[in-house]
Swiss-Prot record:
Source species: Novosphingobium aromaticivorans
InterPro entries: Aldolase/citrate-lyase_domain (IPR005000), HpcH-HpaI_aldolase (IPR050251), Pyrv/PenolPyrv_kinase-like_dom (IPR015813), Pyrv_kinase-like_dom_sf (IPR040442)
Residues holding substrate: Q149, A176, D177
EC nos: 4.1.3.39
Recorded name of the encoding gene: bphF
Protein name (database record): 4-hydroxy-2-oxovalerate aldolase
Any GO CC annotation of this UniProt entry: cytoplasm
Amino acid sequence: MQTPVNSFKAALREGPVQLGFWLALAHPDIAEICAGQGYDWLLIDGEHGPQTLPGIVAQLRAVEATPPCSAIVRVPGHDSVTIKQVLDLGAQTLMVPMVETAEQAKAIVTASRYPPAGERGLGGARASRWGGYPAYVAEANAQVCIIAQIETATAVDNIEAIAAVDGIDALFLGPADLAATEGLLGASSFDALFKLTGEALARIVATGKPAGILSRDERLVQQFLDGGARFIANGIDSFTFAKGAGDGLRRWRERIAAQGGV
């Protein structure tokens, strides 16, 4: 076998919980730094981050150079051309936002698989090492991993139907968008959101498909750990950098003020 084995996909089925981190700043150095910290996976955010295709390739290379960390690419939407392009870049695991129905899930899977299992177009791109992996087309389908994001009330209603689609490997809850669609934004609504995410998690786990979440709120992360989630992201590069820079500034401002402004 020449096509790299998707270690993240394999780890979803067995082994410890996979811990990840979000890359929103679109820089390969940040990807390399974070991969070197020991994360199991990093998500390259092509939905909200300022990503370009060459930039995604650079981040993929940075993660690949720092094993055993795996890269996930979140594509901007359901567009089949974008899915094909990102897979051709060498990504093996894709996260797809705003999946609300089984029909959408089936179309995403179809776009990610070579015929006869799907409709992904053939091209001599980086994923096949520009033709250097002659067996790539025959081997690629088994290594592709598709994660459907559950982010709306409609998606929650359809959890079981989405999970039942062959080729959907995992479901990932988006608590921020879910809170927005349910009118649960703000600290005063946290208890209701916590109840909603707990119920959604239990339903995902009951389907037998791995569940995941991103949250900077430790209560939600712990809820998913306790509830059987298989992969969790606990931070975002942009927020982590902003907090570190701000905390350092405030600490020294306070120290200087305590010394009379010296």
